[in-house]
């Protein structure tokens, strides 16, 4: 896909540094390179040269690298200017490049052009942003695997399997007199369809599980700590974060707002949220804090309900705002006062109970191990790839279409089954961008940084 305009942006983070990069891509790149450097852009050449303004005054000296189309990141002619990392110098260069016919790039526009020109599929393009934003080594390795195409290859394999199944079903519908639909056999009950659907569902289940692990690696877990006032919620946050992040006092109601802290737990990123104590209150500020606590709980992946083990109360009702799919851990704190030992139990209703002391640290390892387990730590993360919530939703939609197709086959409505398979394939193609709306592309690439 040829773009009529040339784009440019500063590709390195804002602020001063040893080196800064201005990136240019598009049809005017060669002309811009020659006007700015006085050099004719050649392949496999790195030039150390002055960068000049319109009056031939030197803006800086640095390296100019030219990547001709299609052998570049975007698939277009690309120029990189490596200059001193002063924001002033880099803005001089960017302004000069725009004077020569480029325009400032939108966020993610370089990656968008790489996608549109077939250099990356959509999942790989998203992996570029995920690698830049990776908050742990495990997340970075997973993003690299997605960038190398591991996730896309799994999606393509499923897409091809769907293609074969659709081809068989639609051919049988269009040409019922052929060999694959014997007169004595209802082709909708043929083993090819049943076996094909079974294999598809197995592939899909495996990919969906791996994708959920990928989302956890990318996003981490949102862990919300709730409970009545003065049960040790802030102490628990501080203990998990290994810092005095929250104010701890004997005065109930100290925490009025949601306090968040990011923790790296053996490669799993946890966003911990300490919330206001939940109780009846006429204090307007405290009541607002409790409203925010319930709102935060409504977005939780894991809800931790903290109680005082020395004065146990039935507080499970406080978890009422947690989403249905959120994991729930009941922490019985202050065992240093109640005299109980640190331990963990899983009761008959499936609730996880952990007895610990946030003050002394006794039992904290039990909670950390439980959080790691919930995050999928050790679940084949060695070969995990990065993924996003939209990928999980797409695969869930594919599963729904496959279930509907199976029901239509059982009801002998082959045309409707074929339509469900077509829709499943359409949704699957949206993951890699084989089928994508302009709105979807706009939403994805607008979240990228400028210059990428």
Q: Would you name each region that the model predicts?
A:
Residues 1-141, 145, 149, 329-330:
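A glycine-rich (often HGG/GG-containing) alpha/beta subdomain
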Residues 272, 306, 331:
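Generic enzyme active-site microenvironment
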Residues 118, 230, 274:
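Conserved G/P- and acidic residue-centered "switch" motifs that form tight phosphate/ATP-binding loops
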Residues 48-68, 253-281, 299-302:
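Switch I (G2) and immediately adjacent beta-strands of P-loop GTPase domains
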Residues 23, 237, 274:
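Short, acidic/hydrophobic/Gly-rich beta-strand patch recurrent on exposed beta strands
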Residues 286-310:
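Inter-motif core of Ras-like GTPase G domains
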Residues 103, 269-271, 352:
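Conserved beta-strand segments of alpha/beta enzyme cores
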Residues 1-14, 137-264, 281, 299, ...:
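C-terminal-of-GTPase-core extension/linker across diverse P-loop GTPases
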